[in-house]
Design a protein with these regions (language model features):
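Beta-rich, blade/repeat-based domains predominating
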Residues: 1-18, 27, 48-66, 94-108, ...
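Blade-edge beta-strand/turn elements of extracellular beta-propeller
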Residues: 1-3, 32-52, 79-92
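Short glycine/acidic-enriched loop and turn motifs that connect beta-strands
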Residues: 22-25, 74-75, 116-121
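A short loop-to-beta-strand structural motif that recurs across blades of beta-propeller domains
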Residues: 27-29, 76-78, 127-132
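Short loop/turn segments immediately following beta-strands, especially the blade-tip
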Residues: 30-39, 135-141
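Flexible "stalk/tail and boundary" regions
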Residues: 78-89, 95-96, 104, 110, ...
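Blade-level signature of beta-propeller repeat domains, shared across WD40, Kelch, NHL, RCC1
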Residues: 101-149
């Protein structure tokens, strides 16, 4: 793994997802996850993003167990089913979405951050570096805080 990114967990906490954003990889991995010990096992390819536009970046999971990931360099957010099938894609007004997370009172708003590279011509992407909200029918989950022993 070159550039780990896109860590998220299934609703039951028993599957951990991790993407590799490096252009030579562009894979999203799934692991069995032991919620008692915190040990991942059974690494397998969940999605190969090479045939899709964009590189995998930040991600989250909804209550249906679907994995949402920013497609950096493509201006898209992809949603994959728990079986790894592309369910839908949503456009955002920038080329480099970087992270997504559900929020709002009903957890049905997907908030998306973006990157504003130093060399960018803002006349091409005036909203680069902005944060966007996408209203969805899908519902997110609150994140489980880390509790060190």
């Amino acid at each position: 793994m070159f550039t780990p990114n896109g860590m998220a967990f299934s609703p039951d906490g028993r599957t951990m997802y991790l993407s590799d954003s490096h252009p030579k990889s562009q894979l999203i991995w799934a692991f069995d996850y032991d919620i008692t010990t915190g040990a991942p096992s059974n690494q397998r390819v969940f999605v190969d993003m090479n045939p899709l536009p964009g590189r995998p970046d930040g991600a989250t999971v909804d209550t249906d167990g679907c994995y949402w990931i920013c497609a950096n360099d493509a201006g898209l957010i992809h949603r994959f089913t728990p079986q790894g099938k592309l369910d839908c894609s949503h456009e955002v007004p920038v080329k480099k979405p970087s992270m997504c997370s559900f929020g709002g009172a009903d957890m049905k708003t997907l908030y998306i951050t973006s990157i504003r590279p130093a060399h960018i011509d803002l006349s091409d992407q005036p909203l680069a570096g902005g944060v966007f909200a996408l209203r969805l029918n899908a519902q997110g989950m609150t994140e489980t805080p880390f509790k060190p022993n």
